[in-house]
Amino acid sequence: MSKTIFIIGGAGYVGEMLTHQFSLRDDVDTIIALDKEPQSDFSQSLDKVIYIQANMADETWQAEVAKHNPDTVIHTAWQIRAMYGQADKQWDWNVGGSDKVFAFAFSTPSVQKLIYFSTASSYSARKDNRFSHLFTEEEGFRDDDYIYAKEKKVSEEHLYAKYQEAKQKGQSVPQVTVVRPAAITGPRGRYMRIRFGLQSALQGNLKGGIVNRIVTLLTSFVPATKGWVRQFIHEDDVNDIVMKFTFEAMPWDYNVFNIVPVSEPVFAPDMATAVGKKVLPIQPWMARFAFWFFWHTTRGRIPTCPSSWRFYSYPLLMSGEKLAK
């Protein structure tokens, strides 16, 4: 039976990638892509796509989507880049919008599966984190002042509470799968989308504009603390995981997975070698000051919002063992 897939965040990096991959499958009839941004030329070229331009926090999309009877909901949308001076608006978009997505998934009879993209950030980057400790799904998230980590933690809590409430009422609920990805990378992320990210900056791929020129200058070396480390997952692996969770019968009602390879992480010397640069050793206080300075002087155009400096300064590594099994 052909599936109808509803992707929230259909104009984003992951959402558009999944839209493309689903459109190539014979067992998919329709992909409904929702995003607050306009549909890209690439997305317009894809078959089977119904595009709805709306913010997930709005009340304008639910009836339109419901009439297509989606059986799988994949929530990839997020305003990741912090909005300077607009924290309440951002919270409404992200947390409030996610609540509406969850409410739709639990109240629409056709929905059989809900896949939610969460984050590694909500494990919290702290001074006492160690390279040797890999956070597992069972440890759960920790409180953090970094707005992205805080919002994602609250949204996961809301999702689980919504699930528990529905189960207690004896309602039929979709199978829920939460994925917490490492940093997603690959050729699509590097070249098909304009992304203001760590790899783009270090590789010198940011083009045009005074802000991008400043960032490129600042990353002529790889500035790194002793605790700097990253985990990456290839976009093809993300796609394969989502396809597996979408099309195969899974033996759970609600489950959470770190999606990260069971392999060595990328340390600062590794990153420097990969981008052909040298490491510039710095202290955490230097990162904190730089992040504060550029956040306020550029009014958020350089994405260094409060508390995000800790994720550049201290290790945060996940275990991928649960998924590997």
Name what the model sees in each region.
Residues 54-96, 125:
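NAD(P)H-binding glycine-rich loop region in Rossmannoid oxidoreductase-like domains
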